[in-house]
Design a protein with these regions (language model features):
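Class I S-adenosyl-L-methionine-dependent methyltransferase catalytic core
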Residues: 1-191
Length: 191
């Protein structure tokens, strides 16, 4: 796994997903699709990733100039990300949390100065809420309900192709969905 662009381009991320349970690694192909849609320059943009895993989406966004908020409830993955942030001296660009994703989003929503331009949602593929809703859909709904997105913001959701996300979730509308192997990458915007 490596950073594909920006100031950190070429750096290797020494993440071994066998050590971290249900964490998947986003392929360079999917990452290039996401960041191709976001654009090469992210200076002044703010990104959230409630299911950070290895942190690779956050590092890539920081490499391109974004301010980043990462969360992962798994203590081992959180520790791995914290070590990379320290080693690569990214503490001024990346805020890291270790809590339930819904509680974390609620906490972020309390700070009205932080509407986000970008969100990357990639929960464990088979994860569901206690009500039986896929966590990918529940997280999209929470982001919409908590007004966390800038009016021109966009959300990228990586999910299993077995889950078909609705065209509309609250104030969010799906603008694109493309298959990458066993994954779908769906994009949502307000409106």
């Amino acid at each position: 796994m490596r950073i594909i662009s920006g100031t950190l381009k070429g750096r290797r991320i020494p993440f071994n997903n066998r050590k971290f349970g249900d964490a998947r690694v986003t392929s360079d192909f999917v990452k290039e699709a996401v960041f191709g849609a976001m654009g090469p320059e992210l200076t002044g943009k703010r990104l959230i990733d409630p299911f950070a895993g290895s942190g690779q989406i956050g590092y890539e966004a920081a490499s391109r100039g974004a301010a980043v908020w990462l969360n992962d409830r798994d203590k081992k993955r959180h520790g791995f990300i914290r070590n990379i942030i320290q080693e690569w001296e990214l503490a001024d660009q990346i805020d890291l949390s270790n809590e339930d994703w819904h509680r974390w989003l609620k906490r972020l929503s309390a700070d009205a100065s932080l509407p986000f331009h970008l969100a990357y949602v990639d929960p464990p593929y088979d994860a569901v809420t206690p009500e039986g809703m896929p966590e990918s859909e529940a997280c999209l709904s929470a982001i919409a309900d908590l007004n966390l997105l800038n009016p021109d913001g966009q959300i990228f959701v990586q999910h299993t192709r077995r889950i078909i996300l609705p065209d509309q979730i609250g104030s969010l509308h799906q603008t694109k969905s493309k298959r990458y192997g066993d994954s779908l990458l769906s994009r949502y915007r307000l409106g």
